[in-house]
Structures are given as C-alpha cells and as structure tokens.
C-alpha cells in the first residue's frame, strides 16, 4: 500500500489468540539496515505504543524476533488525508470537513496533554478510515518536550530545511520559530495544524502552491498568510490566522481549538458566511496584517 522511509508498507490480516481477525498495515524494515536504522524504525513504534486515543493511529504490535522486522498498526482503508481529499474534491459538506478537522484537533490535544510534540503534522501524515475518522500518524519525528531540542539537528540554511533523525523538516508546515531557532513546542504544532486546516478546506491543495521554500520563509517573515480557500467559512479562516500568529504565545491551545470547532458544529449557521471568494489571488498570499 505504500513505501515508507525504511521500507514498504503492506496490508495484511492479524489473528491473535482469542481475538477476531483484523485488517492491519505492516511496515517492514528493508534488508541491509544498520543498527541505528533498526533503532530509529522501532522508536516510532515505541512512541505510538504509549498512545491510546481514537484519533491517533493504533499500534497493534511489533515483530522483532525474526526478519524482516515489522511494525503492525490498525489499517486505514482510505489512506493518507491529502490524497483522499484530492480524489474526492468538492464532495463533502462543510460540516463533514469541520468534523475531520475536529478529529485531528482532538488527537493533537491528546498528544500535547501527553507532552508530545509531533513536529511533522501535515495532511500527508494523517490517515483516514472507512468511516471518515482521521488519525494522526507518522511519529518518526515526534519528541518528548523535555528532550534537548538541539540534539538531533544540524542546520541546513541553504535549502531552508533542517536535517533531523526523522529526515528533513517540511518548511511550509513548520512554524517560523521552529525553522529559525529549532523551537519545537505544542505551539509550533498548532501552526502546522493551521496549515492542515487550509489543506482540508482546499481539498488537498499544496500550501503556498509553487513558491520556493525560501520565498515561503521570506513571505511569512513579512507577515503574509495563506488566503481562505474557495468557499471557506470566514470563522474557519480566522481560526487558521490565529494558528499562524507570529508570537507563539498568542496562538490558541489545542483544547481551545477543539472547543471552537465543537461550537461551530453545534451552530452550523456560523459556517454560512464565506469571504469574497478568492480561489487563488494574484498576490498569491494575503497582504501583511497591518499592526493594530
């Protein structure tokens, strides 16, 4: 069903003694791996195994006694959220889209309550099951908050990405302070969540379109922000802008985001008002917000 960082991902069936057979996803570690690769591969499972939440991908187990080494998780029929949205462009109601966003926010609230920072939150790292339930996955870059933020990082100024144990840091999803000072916190996850909101409401469009990473960094620094996707309710775009506050202390907490989305779901009329529809403005991004 896909290729992971360490090898292929297959679907299969798991039958544990005394339990019914279930569908699972099986990540394998390709042959010829180093000790460090094996540790990195299995560290994702040890992180996942600590979580128990309906919006976090569930670890079923690992196979380490024989080769290939495997990580077994629940199977998500609809695959990654970005591809799923592109395939179903325009097919969902606003309430369904907000329901998707609420699930993701709920999973992220749980992670932040557990003092976990994901660092790589993006629609491609969210999986969708047959009931449209979304679950946060891909814990290859997650860290416990207490960890020394400098440990795994070497700066790569030229490309505008950072090298980490989990690979390169995705500039267009990452908060400015995380790019510049490697300050990864739940508040930088909130910035990424705002980008995920934009991806969901635009049905999987690429954030900042064809701009280069350097141009994205510069634009954000100058105060530009992504415009509302077509037909996006004003209240949702405002929440995105809140997530993209330059000062991380001013961004909402995931608990507040969950509450706001619940409120919108309870009052569907609050989702009626959409802005003057700009699909893709010539300026590409919103004008910098003028200082009040």
UniProtKB/Swiss-Prot annotation:
Top-level taxon of origin: Eukaryota
Binding, ATP: 1-9, 27
Q: Where in the cell is it found?
A: Cell membrane; Early endosome
Q: Kind of enzyme, top EC level? A: transferase
User: Key word ATP-binding present in the record?
Assistant: yes
| Residue ranges occupied by any Protein kinase domain in the UniProt entry | 1-265
What catalytic activity does the UniProt entry give for this protein?
L-tyrosyl-[protein] + ATP = O-phospho-L-tyrosyl-[protein] + ADP + H(+)
Provide the positions where the record notes the PTM Phosphotyrosine: 153
Return the EC number.
2.7.10.1
The protein's matches in SUPFAM superfamilies, at most eight in alphabetical order, are given as: Protein kinase-like (PK-like) (SSF56112)
Q: Which InterPro entries match?
A: Ephrin_rcpt_TKs (IPR050449), Kinase-like_dom_sf (IPR011009), Prot_kinase_dom (IPR000719), Protein_kinase_ATP_BS (IPR017441), Ser-Thr/Tyr_kinase_cat_dom (IPR001245), Tyr_kinase_AS (IPR008266), Tyr_kinase_cat_dom (IPR020635)
Molecular function (GO) terms for this protein are: ATP binding; transmembrane receptor protein tyrosine kinase activity
Tissue expression profile of the protein: Widely expressed in the developing nervous system.
Membrane topology listed for this record: Single-pass type I membrane protein
* A single cellular component GO annotation: early endosome
Membrane-spanning ranges: none
What is an example of a Pfam family matching this protein? Answer: PK_Tyr_Ser-Thr
Similarity comment: family membership? Belongs to the protein kinase superfamily. Tyr protein kinase family. Ephrin receptor subfamily.
The function of this protein is:
Receptor tyrosine kinase which binds membrane-bound ephrin family ligands residing on adjacent cells, leading to contact-dependent bidirectional signaling into neighboring cells. The signaling pathway downstream of the receptor is referred to as forward signaling while the signaling pathway downstream of the ephrin ligand is referred to as reverse signaling. Highly promiscuous, it has the unique property among Eph receptors to bind and to be physiologically activated by both GPI-anchored ephrin-A and transmembrane ephrin-B ligands including efna1 and efnb3.
Protein name as annotated: Ephrin type-A receptor 4a
Q: Which organism is it from?
A: Danio rerio
Q: Which gene encodes it?
A: epha4a
């Amino acid at each position: 069903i896909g290729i992971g960082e360490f090898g292929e991902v297959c679907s299969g069936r798991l039958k544990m003694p005394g339990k019914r057979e279930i569908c699972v996803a099986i990540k394998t570690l390709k042959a010829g791996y180093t000790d460090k690769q094996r540790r990195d591969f299995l560290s994702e499972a040890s992180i996942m195994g600590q979580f128990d939440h309906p919006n976090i991908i569930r670890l079923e187990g690992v196979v380490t006694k024989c080769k290939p080494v495997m990580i077994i998780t629940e199977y998500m029929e609809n695959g990654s959220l970005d591809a799923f949205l592109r395939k179903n462009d325009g097919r969902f109601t606003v309430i369904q889209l907000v329901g998707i966003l609420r699930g993701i926010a709920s999973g992220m609230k749980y992670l932040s309550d557990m003092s976990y920072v994901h660092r790589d939150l993006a629609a491609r790292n969210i999986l969708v099951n047959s009931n449209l339930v979304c679950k946060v996955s891909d814990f290859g870059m997650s860290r416990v908050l207490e960890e020394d933020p400098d440990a795994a990082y070497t700066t790569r100024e030229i490309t505008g990405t950072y090298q980490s144990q989990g690979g390169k840091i995705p500039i267009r999803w990452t908060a400015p302070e995380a790019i510049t000072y490697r300050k990864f916190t739940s508040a930088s996850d909130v910035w990424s969540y705002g980008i995920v909101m934009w991806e969901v409401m635009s049905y999987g469009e690429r954030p900042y379109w064809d701009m280069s990473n350097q141009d994205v960094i510069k634009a954000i620094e100058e105060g530009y922000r992504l415009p509302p996707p077509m037909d996006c309710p004003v209240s949702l775009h405002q929440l995105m802008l809140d997530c993209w506050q330059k000062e991380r202390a001013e961004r909402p907490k995931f608990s507040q985001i969950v509450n706001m989305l619940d409120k919108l779901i309870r009052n569907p009329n609050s989702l009626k008002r959409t802005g003057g529809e700009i699909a893709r403005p010539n300026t590409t991004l919103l004008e910098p917000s003028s200082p009040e």
